[in-house]
């Protein structure tokens, strides 16, 4: 009797939680289908007018990416530069009056007689400026700065009196060196007792150069450019490896293997060349230059050969320095405004 009673109790509890069935609901689509369709605002657009734009947008072209856009910009506008734009180089100065270095009217050739003496025209001191003076008074600021700094360093090291003695000795050695060269290159004279002179190291330094020099035409001879109004005293005019050159002998304590190490010496050489070619005292024409840097310790000298093209370039620079000097002199002589 216990089992039926328990079962009845369970049924009564389940009846409490039973859910009543909802009445059936019918979904009707008739009203939706029969209702009036709303008009789309885009249908009012003139589609034919924009058909080309639609086709271009919906075309099957490659998708644009940041990389492709950058490449396109590079093609259209060039690559993006992260550096500053380079400043335009200053235009090279050109002389106002381009006087030629060579004399087209001169056809005379140098004499080849070994017994004839080289020209030795003395320098006449007058109001015409010398090549050395012109170059000194138009020295570029950078070159002048380094020269002054060298002087200050030497004075600190040697003192005022010591530096004066040093420069005096350098000048004396250079003078003796040129005197010895004049003796070597003159047919009538010979160098004697070279080893007892201070310049013996310099002479040893240029031995390999002397073997290639012949046909000496002038030694320690004055030149004057009648048209450009300047004078000078050249060291030598002779043939070097078969080319007639104005030769400038220089001494140095430091090696100068490059022509730019000689500073204004090339301008000095071409100034003498132009003067020789237009000086009535000389019948020949010089087309090349040679700078020989000799060393006191006897180490091989450095020869710097200047061909016709290089001489023409330095000649243009010399004309600029000459114009600068002339302009400075005009400014100095001009009367001050009242």
UniProtKB/Swiss-Prot annotation:
Enzyme class of the recorded protein, top EC level: hydrolase
Full protein name: Mitochondrial genome maintenance exonuclease 1
UniProt transit peptide range: 1-64
Coiled coil (UniProt feature): none
Subcellular location(s) of the protein: Mitochondrion
Catalytic residues as annotated in Swiss-Prot or TrEMBL: 235, 248, 250
Family indicated by similarity: Belongs to the MGME1 family.
Statement: the UniProt record of this protein carries the keyword Hydrolase: yes
Pfam families: PDDEXK_1 (PF12705)
Function field: Metal-dependent single-stranded DNA (ssDNA) exonuclease involved in mitochondrial genome maintenance. Has preference for 5'-3' exonuclease activity but is also capable of endonuclease activity on linear substrates. Necessary for maintenance of proper 7S DNA levels. Probably involved in mitochondrial DNA (mtDNA) repair, possibly via the processing of displaced DNA containing Okazaki fragments during RNA-primed DNA synthesis on the lagging strand or via processing of DNA flaps during long-patch base excision repair. Specifically binds 5-hydroxymethylcytosine (5hmC)-containing DNA in stem cells.
Single biological process term from Gene Ontology: mitochondrial genome maintenance
Statement: the UniProt record of this protein carries the keyword DNA repair: yes
Lineage: Eukaryota, Metazoa, Chordata, Craniata, Vertebrata
Keywords of the record: DNA damage, DNA repair, Exonuclease, Hydrolase, Mitochondrion, Nuclease, Transit peptide
EC number annotated for this UniProt entry: 3.1.-.-
Gene: Mgme1
Molecular function (Gene Ontology), one example: single-stranded DNA 5'-3' DNA exonuclease activity
InterPro entries named in the record: PDDEXK-like_dom_sf, PDDEXK_AddAB-type
GO cellular component: mitochondrion
Top-rank lineage group of the source organism: Eukaryota
């Amino acid at each position: 009797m216990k089992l039926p009673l328990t079962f009845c109790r369970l049924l009564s509890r389940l009846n409490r939680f039973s859910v009543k069935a909802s009445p059936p609901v019918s979904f009707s689509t008739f009203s939706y289908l029969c209702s009036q369709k709303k008009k789309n605002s885009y249908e009012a657009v003139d589609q034919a007018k924009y058909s080309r734009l639609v086709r271009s947008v919906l075309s099957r072209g490659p998708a644009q990416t940041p990389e492709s856009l950058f490449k396109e910009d590079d093609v259209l506008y060039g690559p993006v530069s992260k550096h500053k734009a380079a400043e335009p180089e200053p235009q090279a100065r050109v002389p106002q009056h381009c006087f030629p270095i060579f004399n087209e009217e001169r056809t005379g050739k140098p004499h080849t007689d070994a017994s004839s003496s080289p020209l030795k025209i003395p320098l006449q001191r007058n109001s015409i400026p010398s090549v050395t003076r012109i170059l000194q008074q138009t020295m570029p600021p950078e070159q002048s700065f380094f020269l002054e700094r060298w002087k200050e360093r030497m004075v600190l090291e040697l003192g005022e009196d010591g530096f004066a003695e040093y420069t005096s000795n350098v000048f004396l050695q250079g003078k003796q060196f040129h005197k010895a060269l004049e003796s070597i290159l003159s047919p009538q004279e010979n160098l004697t007792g070279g080893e007892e002179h201070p310049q013996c190291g310099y002479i040893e330094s240029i031995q390999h150069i002397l073997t290639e020099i012949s046909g000496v035409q002038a030694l320690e001879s004055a030149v004057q450019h009648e048209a450009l109004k300047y004078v000078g005293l050249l060291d030598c005019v002779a043939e070097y490896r078969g080319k007639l050159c104005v030769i400038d002998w220089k001494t140095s304590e430091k090696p100068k293997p490059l022509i730019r190490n000689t500073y204004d010496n090339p301008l000095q050489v071409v100034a003498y060349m132009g003067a020789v070619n237009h000086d009535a005292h000389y019948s020949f024409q010089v087309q090349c230059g040679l700078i020989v840097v000799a060393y006191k310790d006897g180490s091989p000298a450095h020869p710097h050969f200047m061909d016709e093209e290089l001489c023409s370039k330095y000649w243009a620079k010399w004309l600029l320095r000459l114009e600068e000097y002339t302009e400075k002199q005009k400014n100095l002589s001009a009367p001050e405004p009242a």
